[in-house]
Design a protein with these regions (language model features):
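Alpha-helical transmembrane segments in inner-membrane proteins
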Residues: 5-291
């Protein structure tokens, strides 16, 4: 029934928002960069390439939202491998390049490379493959069926749990890597755990709901502006809750047309996210986030 599917959608939106916001916060802290997030660093596009390979090359007949279990698992695995690969590349470059702006540019370049690969896959794919990929790419919280919801919830909760366990190392990273090492934090292990958690959360949300932009980028800033602190003890839970709330708001806007159809999610998130980012950039001198 539509009432039941609305409940699943809300639950998916809540978890998705929490996952993307937590990923954005972790990346901003890890790279000490207020403009880091899964979509800008190319992690979402890595996941999208994984999905495209499965949807368009593997079996052009997989349609968005009605994956069989094996097809749907392969989509998740594809997304996870894609996002982890990009995270690995970014981490590799982060050891070579200390300038965080340059790192963002590398992420954007990776995004361009993956989107050109996706364009090629679209060119050689079947019409229904392209159509299902296009629909998926618009973003939709309705992509998780009742059968898939327990799996989706479990994986997302596991990723969020890892982030909560990383609060202490994240706080240490804020003060700089040298200081964190003096506190006895294993930087490499922390970064690897952050890599896995962010990869897991980004891959799961991207595989199910499409590449959703701006939630991961904007929400940590909203939370910081509300709290006036960068301490992850309070910042991480508030970021998660705000992410969930904003995703629910976006979901509400998406379903406003009712019978006329659903507004694509990626038509709504930038409208909310972009003004916040512009505000943060304009007032960056006043807002002291990072050390």
């Amino acid at each position: 029934s539509s009432a039941a599917s609305d409940v699943y959608k809300r639950q998916t939106a809540l978890l998705c928002g929490m996952a993307l916001a937590a990923s954005g916060l972790m990346l901003q802290t890890t790279f000490n960069n207020p403009l880091a997030d899964p979509s800008i660093l190319g992690i979402s596009s890595g996941a999208s390439l994984g999905v495209a390979l499965v949807m368009l090359a593997g079996a052009g007949t997989i349609t968005a939202g009605v994956f069989t279990l094996s097809g749907f698992l392969s989509v998740i695995i594809g997304a996870f491998i894609g996002s982890m690969l990009v995270m690995g590349i970014i981490l590799f470059f982060s050891t070579l390049i200390k300038n965080s702006i340059m790192l963002l540019i590398i992420g954007i370049m990776i995004g361009y490379i993956t989107s050109s690969a996706i364009s090629l896959l679209n060119f050689f794919s079947t019409a229904e493959g392209v159509h299902s990929y296009m629909i998926w790419g618009m973003g939709n919280f309705g992509g998780v069926s009742l059968q898939q919801l327990p799996f989706f919830s479990l994986v997302t909760m596991a990723g969020l749990l890892i982030t909560i366990l990383l609060i202490k190392p994240l706080n240490a990273l804020l003060l700089g890597t040298r200081y964190a090492e003096n506190l006895g934090i294993n930087i490499r292990r922390t970064r690897n755990l952050l890599l896995v958690a962010t990869g897991l959360l980004t891959a799961t949300t991207t595989a199910f709901c499409g590449p959703i932009s701006f939630i991961g980028l904007a929400v940590p800033h909203i939370a910081r502006l509300m709290l006036g602190t960068s301490n992850h003890n309070s910042l991480l839970p508030v970021t998660m809750l705000t992410g969930g709330a904003i995703a629910l708001l976006c979901n509400f806007i998406c379903i406003l047309p009712g019978e006329a159809g659903i507004i694509p999610l990626n038509a709504v998130t930038p409208v909310i996210g972009a003004p916040i980012i512009i505000y943060v950039i304009v007032n960056q001198r006043k807002i002291q986030y990072f050390n």
